[in-house]
Amino acid sequence: DHVETGTQMRQHVFTILGGKALVELAEPFDLDPAEAAGRGFSIRYLDGETGDWIMAQHWPNPNFDGIAFMDQLTGASHLGRVQVYSHDVPQSTPEQAAIRRYTFSDITEERFRWDGAVTRDDGDSWAIWQVVDFTRQADEAMSTPRGGRWPGHHDGLLCADEAHRAMDGVIGRWNSQFVLPDGTIIDGRLDAGPMLEGCGIGAISRIGSTEYFLGWAWSPMLQLWVQMTLSDRPGERHTYAISGTGGEGAVFLSAPSATISSQTENYYSGLGTAATDARSRQMIEVFQSDRIEIRMQARQDAEADWSEAGRLVLTRED
């Protein structure tokens, strides 16, 4: 903000999924939802098979909805720096694409530096728009939402409208059973809590021996509910599913083309074909205060019929 002392924020940073991913939740000191900027979520992880760093984020503020966990970058580590890139949708024009770059540098146990930059000439020049210095204040460990909510969430006043509330029924502690088509039952649990002042829900789920992070958020810009999923399985990247509605009756269609695979291409362009390209879908058939049932189906290709893949049954513990 070009003031003498800069803008100060609190960042909660911790690992999840057995150390596979690093989560950052940013909390502005000014909590007035009408004015506060800088509240956000990011998840970063290394694809051990390719050496790529992948980052997905959701930074809602009063002027921009944050695109519901679908804001992504990818890159690599170079000379002690981690640099990730992606197509910059807000800054691009039909005549000239803009590419943004995030750089994590000067990384030690006690501090690191981040800067954000953009190029409109294919990398010949870069304009840095922000530099942030991070200093460790205390260690933070998280395995599930603490106290029923994620760090930095207070009164839920930033996204308080009805459209953002359709998935609130999943918040809480649940026992789960995943029922396979042959009748086999795999036990598990799910802990979900609000985050980002009402602009998202995050959950840690375990089904059998596999652990997952799930995020749900409504995007006013896309007019879609977005579900993000990342498992603890090595080499497996995050995925998205989208639905026009949330809650009972919602159908979340897989959107494989929405997961970033290029540092320069517009990955949002694939959302328009999600309904025809989807290889899996999740249908919320029961969404009650003490029970949720989700029917899973899959298909081989866009022309094939849907087949049953299982049913997830959640019963509330708290």
Predicted regions and their residues:
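Hydrophobic small-molecule pocket/channel-lining residues, especially in calycin-type beta-barrels
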Residues: 1-318
